[in-house]
């Protein structure tokens, strides 16, 4: 099952145990593999939630403002105000986000079948964290979240099962350009197999890093304690 198919079940669980603030749709321009038996999926769901209704959370709306569609690029004046002023041409994004999927020829492409675009994760990181905060991604893939977090002055904790993706992570986060005497370079080949026998936790910032290899059960135990 895909993330889109799982979401109804996850939504019910999260709604019963947490406080859902927003249900976001990431809309993209291609469904990838074309099916002749059903409609192709052109979106992925995202839940924004807190532990409970009393939880304090960060929402930096000023850091994620986008251009408001006014129908014209000229300066518009709002005469409804006591002192006429230019219309605000910026607005907070709604809950439907349009970002293209990562394609093979893009500079940010890494060898992963479901890589998320940096622009998508940057919006989430900027909105929900402040500088020097720690951003956790327990299913890191190519470590785009961690990479974006560090670029924007945050620290990052990334967790990943696959050794090859882990190598991508330590390269993208700037921890090292080598791994066990292997020089790490971007691989521009097509998608890899998404499996591994071990978990790796990486804690990284600009000045320090910790790397731990863990068994799957222990990794999940840590996740449960974190959340």
For each feature predicted by the language model, list its residue ranges.
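PRPP-dependent phosphoribosyltransferase catalytic core
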Residues: 167-227
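Core catalytic lobe of class I
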Residues: 1-168, 214, 219, 223
